[in-house]
């Protein structure tokens, strides 16, 4: 069990270590901890026994272990403080006109990368919860066409496909009509269910040639299940992550899944310190925070960095960006709901 004084010592060691990246000795703690040097050394030894501190090879000082950072994250972080001195710079970064949701998310990721020196990922609303608000088919050539989806009036997804053999022009019109009548206004999850339950019977009723039509439905809608993800500062991973982690970030859909699984449905914010047993994010820290996307749901901002982060500072920065981002998104969707349209 960690005593209150030991927790204060651990917090102070982490605070000093994240700024200096040097082992911390008992003398460096005496000004802030109202105890003798011997008492502090005993407490440091006890923290080491509990696996929260570890000895440095070249110094008599101690530094936090991964378990120590995990304990700090769980027991000492303040998730409600704002870094007032950085509010102006963050607000200033968003003081521009945006024409696409992805551009707003990218600005958020770029800003947090510049502030933190880490890798940042921004996720849109979970794909299964987005609604299909518009659909069209554009014929590209004799054998190819493009399905164009609009989700939540703000995200465009396209899927190119081969027109089935023996498909007539009127069959493409039927396909378009069925999708517009049956799917518009429904969530992607509802559409997935309808393709498996309702569409097979409808195909039999409306199409003379039914070969591969159900496969065509599944093909053109597959893209809608992909996460809308933006990333910034991937190259920063080379400063603190192993090659496997860097290569993992070449798979954005897997990255999105990893981030979502690290944040429970009832959590708005979480700090996860991954140990060496978690191969894809081994010895990395992930600070993830949900933000409101007005009229649509919530997205996620995630900072990925080394274990020895200045967690409190980064939490402050994420909180400020979240609030400013939500205000900007409110203006953006108010604009979309007027007589204006997003430029794609």
Swiss-Prot record:
Keywords: Repressor, Stress response, Transcription, Transcription regulation
GO biological process: negative regulation of DNA-templated transcription
Pfam family, one: HrcA_DNA-bdg
Alphabetical list of InterPro entries matching this protein: GAF-like_dom_sf, HrcA, HrcA_C, WH-like_DNA-bd_sf, WH_DNA-bd_sf, WHTH_HrcA_DNA-bd, WHTH_transcript_rep_HrcA_IDD
A molecular function (GO) term: DNA binding
Keyword Cell inner membrane appears in the UniProt entry: no
Physiological role: Negative regulator of class I heat shock genes (grpE-dnaK-dnaJ and groELS operons). Prevents heat-shock induction of these operons.
Family membership: Belongs to the HrcA family.
HAMAP family: HrcA
Protein name per the record: Heat-inducible transcription repressor HrcA
Species of the source: Streptococcus pneumoniae (strain 70585)
